[in-house]
Amino acid sequence: MNGDAPKVGYVGLGQMGSAMAGRLLETGVELIVFDLDPETMAEAVGLGAEPAGSTAEVAAFADVVSICVPDAHHVSSVLDGLGESAVVGLPVLVHSTIHPEAMAACRMQAAIWGGVLHDVCVAGGAVAASAGELALFVGGRADLPPAAAALLSYYSSHIVEAGPVGSGAAMKLAFNVLTYAQFAASAVAFEIAEGAEVDTDALVDAWRHVGQLGSLTEQFLPVLSIPAEHVVGDFRDSLRSTVDIARKDLRLAADLCVVGGLGDMVEALEKAMPEVFGVADEIWEAL
C-alpha cells in the first residue's frame, strides 16, 4: 500500500456498487473495477476508475477488494478469480446480502489462498452511498486489516460492529425485513386511500409529521403513483430486478426466523413483492 490511501478493487457495478465506487473516486481513492456489463464499466472508467479485464487483474492491483454482486454463488465465483493472483493477506470486503452461513463459507474459501474476508453489508440505498452516508453492518470489525478499516468512513456515516464474521449479513437481513415491510404497508395504505378517494399527499404529510416515514420508504413512494401503463420497457425490467433482490433477501430472512409463525409472515411478504412494486403478472409469477 502506498501512503495512507489503499488502492481499491471493486467487483460488481450494479446500482449500489456503482454508487459506492463513485463515492470512492470522489474521495480520491485509486480504484480498479470489474463488471460483466460493459456499460457500467464505461461509466466507472469515465469517472476515473481503471478498468480490469478479470477479477484476477483486480486482485493483482488492489490493497483491498470490495465485492458487491447479487448472490452467494456470485461471491464464490469472484473469490475463485481473486485467488489466481492475490497476495497472502489481501482483505476482501463483501457488501452483498447473503446468508450468514454462506458468508462464513466464503471466508473459508478466501482463506485457502490467504484472503481475509469480512462481511461489510450496506444499507441506505444508492443515494446514501453517493453522499457517503451509508450504514454498515460489519462482521469481525475488530479484526479488519488496517487497509480495509480505513475505507469504511469513506462511504459510511454509521458503522455497526455486528459481531463475528457472518453477523453483519444477519443484521442486514433483519434490517431489510423492516424496509420491505414498510414498502408493502405503504402500498396497502395507498390502495386504501385511493379507493376511498382521499389525498395520498396528505397521508404522506401526516406520516412525515409523526416521524413514521423512513428515508428509504420515502424514496420508494413515487413508484406507487406511477400509472400501470407507464411501467414498461427498461423501467419495468429495473423494477423486476429490484423485486428479485427483495425476494431473495426475504427468503434468506425467513430461513433465519426461529419462530414458525413469524417466518410465515416473512414468506408472505416475499411473495407480495411483485404486487408491491407493481410488476405482478401471470407469466412472471409462474417463473
Show which residues each predicted segment covers.
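Rossmann-fold NAD(P) dinucleotide-binding segment
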Residues: T55-V116
